[in-house]
C-alpha cells in the first residue's frame, strides 16, 4: 500500500542551494531578493533557524527560530518564534497548516521551550500568517499594537488544538 501522507523537507546548509524557498519562485523580478534570503538563511541555520516546507513546487512552508535569535523586535526568552507560515491556493484545507505547526510544536517540546510566539496582522494581510487560523489552533493574543500588528502566544504546546 502506498503512503499517501504528504512529504515535508527541512532546508539545511547542505540542500538549500538546490531547493526552492517558496517565496516568489515564479517571479524573475524577485531573483536578487530570493538569492539574498537564501544566503541569509545559510547564516541563520547556526542559530537554530528552521525552514520546513512541502516537498513540492508550492508555497506551503513554515519558518521559525529560537526567539532569542529572531529578527523581529520581540522579547520572548525560551520560546520559538514563528517568522513566516504560509499555505497558499490549492493547498489550503488539506491539513498542511496543521502538519507544519505540529512540527514546530514537536521541536518546542524536544527543546523544552515554554511555547511559541508570532507576530500577525490585526487585519488580514497577504504577507502575514493567518491570525484567525492561529487563534483557532491554540494561540492567544497577548498584545495588540495601534499600527495593525498583534503578538500571539501559545504558552504551552499542550494547548494545541488537535484536528
Model regions and ranges:
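Surface-exposed beta-loop interaction hotspot
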Residues: 151-163
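Short amphipathic alpha-helix that is part of the acyltransferase structural core
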Residues: 1-55
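A conserved beta-turn-beta hairpin within the catalytic core of GNAT-like acetyltransferases
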Residues: 70-82, 92
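Conserved catalytic-core motifs of GNAT/GCN5-like acyltransferases
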Residues: 119-120, 135-153
